């Protein structure tokens, strides 16, 4: 009897822990959750639910835009409960946003957002323009949940490449792992980083980039300061460069890179000040 109760308790603990991630992917036309969306057209941004596959952990939700941008966007959360499958990224569409609800305060604009991916051709940024179709995937893993977006037939350096962006969320961590790959194994130069707006604090250190402050264009009645950060292996990238709206890093020639991203905000309980967010990286 004791052994049975112990086994049941262990199963319950596993279920609770595993419930701290979620994923979502669907066409707007039917709102049915699916594991994969395949499109012969490169840009179906406005036809896919929340504009692309989305994944959530206890501290944030992320989505990959289903278009040429390669951008990753952020949904900020005040509490550790799951919200993605209930609100589908937009709590205000279900009524007034409650005290415990998160919201879409992050503004990507025309950038790659937080840890999104583009390519670099030695002189300029190359967006993931899919000439041979685009695929999105979402599902569960042993440790949590994942989403993926694949752009097929991206014109690059006098040829074509197929680029995958995958985000893995582990139920035991507040960070998410971003993996970018060229599917045939061809070496390319990946571009990633963290976007920023006028008035935000920007800081860098050994293997990390951080940004703190409200986002220009956030329509909230009271601006919500956000934290956005990226960790990376310095030996894989050139030094951090600052443009007018992006703290970017460019990889050395490689068929695959991995980074970790994190987001926070003043509405959460842990990393809710700029000082705490900065200290997290030290």
Predicted regions span which residues?
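Aromatic sugar-binding interfaces of carbohydrate-active proteins
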Residues: 195, 201-221
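A short, structured loop/turn motif at beta-sheet edges
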Residues: 137-143, 171-172, 182-189, 251-256
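Bacterial Sec-dependent N-terminal signal peptides
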Residues: 1-21
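Acidic (Asp/Glu-rich), glycine- and aromatic
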Residues: 163, 175-205
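Short, exposed beta-strand/loop patches in secreted or surface proteins that constitute
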Residues: 46, 53-55, 132-142, 201-202
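Extended, loop-rich substrate-binding clefts of extracytoplasmic carbohydrate-active enzymes
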Residues: 102-171
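Beta-strand-rich recognition/accessory modules
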Residues: 226-282
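Solvent-exposed N-terminal domain segments of exported/luminal and surface proteins
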Residues: 21-128
């Amino acid at each position: 009897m004791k052994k049975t109760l112990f086994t049941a308790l262990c199963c319950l603990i596993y279920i609770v822990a595993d419930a701290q991630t979620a994923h979502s992917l669907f066409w707007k036309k039917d709102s049915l959750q699916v594991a994969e969306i395949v499109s012969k057209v490169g840009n179906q941004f406005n036809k896919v639910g929340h504009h692309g596959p989305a994944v959530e952990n206890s501290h944030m939700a992320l989505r990959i835009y289903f278009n040429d941008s390669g951008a990753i966007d952020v949904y900020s959360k005040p509490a550790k409960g799951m919200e993605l499958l209930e609100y589908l990224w937009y709590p205000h569409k279900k009524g007034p946003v409650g005290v415990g609800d998160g919201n879409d305060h992050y503004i990507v604009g025309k950038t790659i957002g937080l840890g999104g991916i583009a390519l670099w051709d030695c002189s300029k940024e190359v967006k993931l323009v899919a000439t041979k179709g685009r695929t999105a995937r979402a599902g569960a893993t042993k440790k949590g949940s994942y989403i993926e977006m694949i752009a097929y037939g991206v014109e690059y350096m006098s040829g074509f490449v197929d680029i995958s962006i995958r985000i893995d969320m582990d139920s035991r961590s507040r960070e998410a792992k971003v993996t970018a790959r060229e599917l045939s194994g061809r070496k390319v130069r990946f571009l990633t980083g963290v976007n920023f707006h006028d008035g935000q604090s920007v800081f860098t250190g050994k293997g990390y980039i951080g940004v703190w402050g409200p986002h220009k264009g956030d329509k909230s009645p009271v601006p919500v300061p956000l934290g956005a950060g990226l960790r990376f292996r310095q030996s894989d990238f050139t030094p951090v460069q600052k443009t007018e709206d992006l703290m970017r890093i460019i990889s050395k020639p490689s068929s695959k890179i991995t980074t970790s991203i994190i987001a926070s905000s003043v509405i959460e309980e842990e990393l809710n000040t700029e000082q705490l967010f900065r200290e997290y990286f030290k």
